[in-house]
Amino acid sequence: MNIAAASRDLPALFRPKQRLGFNTRVSFNDDDGPAQGLRQGIELFRQAERLGYQSGWAYQRHFDHYLSSPLPFFAAVGQHTRHITLGSAVIPMRYQDPILLAEAAGTTDLLIDGRLELAISTGANGAFDAVFGTVDTDARTEAKRRQSRFLAAIAGDVLHIVTERDTGAPAGAELRVTPHSPTLRSRIRQGSASLDSAIQAAELGIGLISGTVLHDQAEGETFGQYQARIIDAYRTHWLRIWKTTPPPVAVAASVLVGTTPELREKYAAYDLERRTAGIAASRPKGALAPAGQPVGALISPVFQGTPDAVIEAVLSDPGLAAADELVLFLPPAFGLSENIRLLADLATTVAPSLGWKPASDNQGPEQAAIQGSRPPA
């Protein structure tokens, strides 16, 4: 792989990108079926690692043509890769059993040598209550309750001391989640779409990843301006609460580098579709279209064009400038070869000008994972 040398100085407020990642939905269509989609998803992670990407993320979505259960998928990917970190972006906590999720996460992390990074969210979407069951509070409050329980479980906290008779454990036994991965909690992030959720992440002492949809912005505020404000609030609150250096922040964005006229035309068409259809853009055949876009939501721009045009656009965007890690959001309907081309073109023509260096072949998982001064577990 030929990586172009950076040929320009970075703007003063632009943070060099410590890591380069990608976010895929591991989608499938009605023609090829889910098995092929899953196998191609594994191959995508293999190729990304070959290109020097430090992280790969998969989106979770229930009842659709996308990955519904990321952890067994990551366990499989881990057997085909060596050092790229594997992350969920994101797992909504509203419909998760926190103890079962902690058990599955610990098992997966140990199987893949400590490369798991889980981004979780506490969004207020209760769209599937009819399937998963209703609760006696609102969706966001319930999601936060489950998030708290999950974080305690993966930290190795005692969840219960047995006092009951005729149970599966002796009286006085302290019940903790096993198998326990001691460092996993330090690799949990909050998927943040608002200022409040970023502040909550800082209060909980977990990392932050910002995605392609934001809400609760100020009037007249652009996506990049609001994203930068969210990141700044996270770092400010982290420093105030923990008195340590905040962990690196990741930002997912559509950065589509057109290295040929045909690719530029294709990416411009996707840009137009995203600006007109919003979150419903780029759906694989048979996938469900959202009933509507969240009221007041901001959709991230698509950074597309020639390599030089993309570099200039990324360098001037406040949100991307504030991030430590750039995560390429892959259009959901794109196929394996199209996605590999996107990964390769970003890594070879644009990312070096953002201060990024590819992972080396001998890089271990502890080096590939996010580094920061975390609070005590």
PLM ranges: what are they?
Residues 1-84, 368-369, 375:
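N-terminal beta1-alpha1-beta2 module of alpha/beta enzyme domains
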Residues 2-16, 138-177, 219-323, 357-376:
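An alpha-helical appendage that flanks or caps ligand/catalytic pockets
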Residues 13-36, 95-162, 208, 216, ...:
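Flexible, glycine-rich active-site loops centered on histidine and acidic residues
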Residues 20-24, 56-58, 86-89, 116-120, ...:
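Hydrophobic faces of well-ordered beta-strands that scaffold small-molecule active sites
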Residues 24-39, 91-99, 183-192, 256, ...:
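Active-site mouth loops of central-metabolism enzymes
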Residues 52, 60, 77, 108, ...:
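Conserved, mostly hydrophobic/aromatic
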Residues 55-77, 92, 212-224, 327-338:
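Glycine-rich, proline-tolerant flexible connector loops at the mouths of alpha/beta enzymes
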Residues 68-91, 146, 346-358:
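Alpha-helix-loop-beta-strand connector modules within alpha/beta enzyme cores
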